[in-house]
């Protein structure tokens, strides 16, 4: 009986616990508003890429960090449930797990989001180099800009060294050096990032 080889995806990226509160209206400065409900979910642009890849049937390898806290445990349970390869997921006790605090106005869906990067800001080139052996038989490498640019640049370098497609979601937008932009195979900005990188209002 023949078996189909899964597409292998490597994602160096961020992972967050998302705390979403719903309220009749968003508080003004100094105001306390009683919320109606709270949802604790999983997010981070890297984790979202991973979850989409795994659910599409890919053999998904994550390069990330989680803190030694309750949100880190929550993320690890999600990783296991989704079938993420966890060889390159590091536990980091120097800071908290990444977290997004999201306020949503129930009237119109408007929101405010505060992201605490936590251990995501520690994800660097050395984390990506630790996964170098798995780049050779990967089908694609995906990343985004919620981690240090050194990690993004190293992921691009390693992917290109073995002839693998490199995909960059340039979010959240920040100015990028020309040497990083040059040679990207797939560049996937949304409206905000497209305006930022082109200098043209969109």
Locate each region found by the language model.
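Glycine-rich phosphate/adenosyl-contacting loop at the front of the ribokinase-like
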Residues: 1-65, 70-81
């Amino acid at each position: 009986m023949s078996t189909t080889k899964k597409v292998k995806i490597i994602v160096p990226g961020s992972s967050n616990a998302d705390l979403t509160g719903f309220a009749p209206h968003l508080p003004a400065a100094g105001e306390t508003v009683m919320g109606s409900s709270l949802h604790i979910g999983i997010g981070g642009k890297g984790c979202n890429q991973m979850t989409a890849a795994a659910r599409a049937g890919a053999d998904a390898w994550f390069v990330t960090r989680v803190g030694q806290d309750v949100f880190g445990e929550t993320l690890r349970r999600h990783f296991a449930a989704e079938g993420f390869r966890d060889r390159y997921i590091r536990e980091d006790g120097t800071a908290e797990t990444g977290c997004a605090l999201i306020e949503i106005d129930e009237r119109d869906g408007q929101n405010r989001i505060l992201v605490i990067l936590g251990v995501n800001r520690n994800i660097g080139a050395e984390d990506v180099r630790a996964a170098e052996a798995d780049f050779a038989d990967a089908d694609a490498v995906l990343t985004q800009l919620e981690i240090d640019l050194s990690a993004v640049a190293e992921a691009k370098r390693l992917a290109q060294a073995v002839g693998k497609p490199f995909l960059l979601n340039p979010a959240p937008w920040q100015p990028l050096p020309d040497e990083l932009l040059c040679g990207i195979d797939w560049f996937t900005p949304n409206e905000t990032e497209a305006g930022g990188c082109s200098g043209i209002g969109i």
